[in-house]
Design a protein with these regions (language model features):
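Active-site-adjacent beta-strand anchor residues
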Residues: 30-31, 60, 78
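Secondary-structure junction motif
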Residues: 10, 27-49, 119-120, 136
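A late-sequence structural motif
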Residues: 97-137
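Alpha-helical segments flanking ligand/cofactor-binding loops in enzyme cores
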Residues: 21, 68-69, 123
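Flexible hinge/capping segments at coil-to-helix
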Residues: 3-29, 33
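Beta-alpha-beta core module
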Residues: 12-17, 65-114
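Short beta-strand-to-loop elements that line the ligand-binding cleft
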Residues: 52-63
Length: 137
């Protein structure tokens, strides 16, 4: 999703949530070059008909909490996962805009060797991932 500060300007834009053509006029804060999130954001924007060469990327930041704080403070807008923006959207700190024609997510693979003795914390992590995503053996 695209995130913006919850200001009057973006509240007005939020009324026509399907049109994000205005993104080219905004200062954009992105994840660092090479990150999976940045690659996915680029793919989703291209699918929505946005020319990536016309984007005004003002910062590349590695930490998504820093990105959210920067957006809240009005430095620019950004694209992060829906899940990462959920809390701030619920509290009203940020507005979220779905990216039109976007995929509903990306595949993340969990790979491990069943024959390798894992730590208890690794076993718990795998169990939680399987429960959350409904993965069966």
């Amino acid at each position: 999703v695209m995130i913006t500060p919850n200001t009057e300007k973006y509240q007005v834009l939020h009324q026509n949530i399907e049109d994000i053509s205005w993104i080219s006029e905004e200062c954009l804060i992105m994840r660092e070059e090479g990150s999976g999130t940045r690659k996915e954001a680029g793919k989703q924007l291209r699918n929505a008909g946005i020319n990536l060469d016309k984007l005004k990327i003002i910062a590349s930041i590695e930490n998504q909490e820093t990105i959210k704080k920067s957006v809240k403070q009005g430095m620019g807008i950004s694209i992060i996962s829906r899940l990462a923006a959920e809390e701030e959207a619920k509290s009203g700190d940020l507005l979220t805009f779905p990216i039109p024609k976007a995929d509903q997510g990306r595949d993340i693979n969990l790979v491990y060797n069943k024959n390798y003795q894992m730590s208890k914390s690794a076993e718990r992590f795998i169990k939680v991932v399987k429960e959350v995503y409904g993965i069966e053996e």
